[in-house]
Amino acid sequence: MIYLPDGVQDFLPEEYKFKRKIEEKFREVFIKFGYQEIMPPTFEYNDNFSVLFDENNLYRFFDKKGNILALRPDVTTQIARIVSTKLKGSFPLKLCYVANVYRYDDPQVGKMREFTQAGIELIGTNHEESDAEIIAVAIEALKSIGIEDFKVDVGQVEFFKRVVEDLELQNEEINLLREFLQQKNQSAIEEFINDKGIRGKKAKFLSELPLLFGGEEVLKRAKELYDTPKLGETIDYLERVYRILKDFGMEEYISFDLGMVQNLNYYTGIIFRCFVKGIGYAICTGGRYDGLLGIFGEHIPATGFAISVERSMLALQKQKKDIIDKSWRVLIKYKENLRSNAYKKATLLRGEGKIVEMYSYEKAKHVDENSFDEIIDMEE
């Protein structure tokens, strides 16, 4: 038996047609918002990625010179490098991509070790209009492929960061608390509070942080729980972003989750995830990463998102949506002496956007005629 490695898959013709259509629709939305497509290399020097990603999650290999290379685990990091080294100058800069990425993680539903991301990066701005635009483009992209009943959960890394700073936690404790918040494990958080002897407002805020999700009333509740100037500014910023999205008519898609934490460490501000009703995993993640370009020598603010194409496919399949345009299929059967005429006819029909296959009568005996919408006989 011949097997594939864990975490990769074949896309058969109909599946791949479905996947390509989704990618095309995402790309079309991005371009209409002014984003220019870019394509970084599939692999780079390992050091370009290991500064942000655990090397155990990278696909690494040596070239013939002994250099350690790695398949890209993320496109945003590559774009940060490109902007810092090759696109310095006029900002804001709008870039988009559709590309495969590679992570040696445990395979999940709709997320293999090789998977496709479609995303945008808005570089050189650090105001609420840019964060609102990023979220708006994500919403428009999902709508463009016909996904319904989805929500964009909006958070801010400042909430988790503030808790960690105030409690002076060690790295191991930070990772443990991050895991509890991701799982919204209330009992584990309560146990954590008791074990660490956390008291007063800090204990109250940490206890309620995983519960701070819902509509804009969540922001008011957060201010009441932990009224500090820094968090007050953070909440005010979220309110301004929300007002812009309301002006765009997108409030029905927005909810807040102030206990949200992201796995990627480069996020510095607003973060968000898109969930489809009935599907328990995010199909899109994004946020602000003002410090990432600094790793490559340029301190430039930026924000963006990535949509999982495979998870978008699963969401559409679950909602029983078919976005493939049904092309008219034509079979031309011809006598050997009429091959030239048959080819001219096929060329004419292909120019009209039809799919045309042509076979001599002898070869056509083995063709499934039921798979065609039209059959043309060229006998004379």
Swiss-Prot record:
Gene name for this UniProt entry: hisZ
Annotated GO MF terms: catalytic activity, acting on a protein; histidine-tRNA ligase activity; transferase activity
UniProt-listed Pfam families: tRNA-synt_His
Keywords from the UniProt entry: Amino-acid biosynthesis, Cytoplasm, Histidine biosynthesis
One GO term of the biological process aspect: L-histidine biosynthetic process
Cellular component aspect of the GO annotation: cytoplasm
Broad class of where this protein is predominantly found: cytoplasm
Any further remark recorded for this protein: This function is generally fulfilled by the C-terminal part of HisG, which is missing in some bacteria such as this one.
Pathway(s) it belongs to: Amino-acid biosynthesis; L-histidine biosynthesis; L-histidine from 5-phospho-alpha-D-ribose 1-diphosphate: step 1/9
InterPro entries registered for this protein in UniProt: aa-tRNA-synth_II, aa-tRNA-synth_II/BPL/LPL, HisRS-like_core, HisRS/HisZ, HisZ
Name of the protein in its database record: ATP phosphoribosyltransferase regulatory subunit
UniProt keyword Cytoplasm, yes or no: yes
Source organism phylogeny: Bacteria, Bacillati, Bacillota, Clostridia, Thermoanaerobacterales
Described purpose of this protein according to its UniProt entry: Required for the first step of histidine biosynthesis. May allow the feedback regulation of ATP phosphoribosyltransferase activity by histidine.
Assembly: Heteromultimer composed of HisG and HisZ subunits.
